[in-house]
Swiss-Prot record:
One of its GO terms (molecular function) is ATP binding. The lineage of its organism: Bacteria, Pseudomonadati, Pseudomonadota, Alphaproteobacteria, Rhodobacterales. InterPro entries: ATP_synth_F1_ATPase_gsu, ATP_synth_F1_gsu, ATP_synth_F1_gsu_CS. This is ATP synthase gamma chain. It comes from Cereibacter sphaeroides (strain ATCC 17023 / DSM 158 / JCM 6121 / CCUG 31486 / LMG 2827 / NBRC 12203 / NCIMB 8253 / ATH 2.4.1.) (Rhodobacter sphaeroides). CDD domains: F1-ATPase_gamma. The keyword Transport applies. Produces ATP from ADP in the presence of a proton gradient across the membrane. The gamma chain is believed to be important in regulating ATPase activity and the flow of protons through the CF(0) complex. It is a peripheral membrane protein. Keywords: ATP synthesis, Cell inner membrane, Cell membrane, CF(1), Hydrogen ion transport, Ion transport, Membrane, Transport. F-type ATPases have 2 components, CF(1) - the catalytic core - and CF(0) - the membrane proton channel. CF(1) has five subunits: alpha(3), beta(3), gamma(1), delta(1), epsilon(1). CF(0) has three main subunits: a, b and c. Belongs to the ATPase gamma chain family. It is found in: Cell inner membrane. GO terms for cellular component: plasma membrane; proton-transporting ATP synthase complex.
Length: 289
């Protein structure tokens, strides 16, 4: 049974931990608001751009003049997985859920005889994937110095992907991130960015005249579309990370409070038992006299 001193020290230690988790929860809440606003502000632009490109892609179709970013290489042998996670932990299952989805996708592709290459964005995904998929790594993007996520970061990642695609290093590129829905709900998502995939009809491009041509406009828009999708994913990831951290730190703070209550009860019982024992010894000594 722990001594009163040990129990007192444990109570003090848990109280200090609760202060830290509470502070981290408040910081995450402040960051979440900014990250959520940024993610929500980017969605209309991304949706509008996708609608325009969808219409153009529908008109261009699979013609010989279709841009390579739309038509693809004609093969799906080599897949590049871009796994986006956080630089830090203490955010519940945020990082592990994205890694789990990427790992399952990689396993499926390898089973089909495909070649898998992995580009990690963020420290935590790299750490977790290195254990069993490290031999497939081809690069890493360090976000530790990024204070606020901006479009230039996405442009840099997009340029790297486009350069690798032009060099024939892969056929299909898929990004993995968490789509923000609420503080307690972040959805791990896999989204193909190269070659471009469009669903629905989008804008009716026959209502417009394009110069120099629909193919030319689409060829110019597609690289921007890749950067926009990556930027949107980074913003969604940022909001999801802060939401997950806020929720995790709230749970940790609650658990610390429960532990303090249990330890306090144990401390009071032990103290009461010690006092009772001391009184019995005093009474027994007095009776002996």
């Amino acid at each position: 049974m722990p001594s009163l001193k040990d129990l007192k020290n444990r109570i003090g230690s848990v109280k200090n931990t609760r202060k830290i988790t509470k502070a981290m929860q408040m910081v995450a809440a402040a960051k979440l608001r900014r990250a959520q606003e940024a993610a929500e502000a980017a969605r209309p632009f991304a949706e509008r751009m996708t609608a325009v490109m969808t219409g153009l892609a529908g008109s261009v179709g699979s013609s010989e003049s279709a841009p390579r970013l739309l038509a693809g290489t004609g093969s799906d042998k080599v897949h590049l997985l871009v796994v986006m996670t956080a630089e830090r932990g203490l955010c519940g299952g945020f990082n592990s859920s994205i890694v789990r989805l990427a790992r399952a996708h990689a396993a499926k592709l390898l089973t089909q005889g495909k070649t898998v290459k992995i580009l990690t964005v963020g420290k935590k995904g790299r750490e977790q994937l290195r254990r069993d998929l490290g031999q497939h790594f081809i690069g890493h993007v360090d976000l530790s110095e990024v204070k606020r996520m901006g479009y230039p970061v996405a442009q840099g990642i997009a340029r790297d992907l486009l350069d690798r695609f032009d060099k024939g290093e892969f056929d299909v590129a898929t990004i993995f991130f968490a789509r923000f829905q609420s503080v307690i709900n972040q959805v791990p998502t896999a989204q193909q960015v190269i070659p471009a995939v469009f669903e629905g009809e989008g804008e009716v491009s026959s209502l417009y005249d394009y110069e120099p041509s629909e193919e030319g406009v689409l060829a110019d828009l597609l690289p921007r579309g890749v950067a926009t999708q990556i930027f949107t994913a980074l913003l969604e990831n940022g909001a999801s990370e802060q939401g997950a951290r806020m929720s995790a730190m709230d749970n940790a703070t609650r658990n610390a409070g429960d532990m303090i209550n249990r330890l306090t009860i144990e401390y009071n019982r032990s103290r009461q038992a010690a006092i009772t024992k001391e009184l019995i010894e005093i009474i027994s000594g007095a009776e002996a006299l």
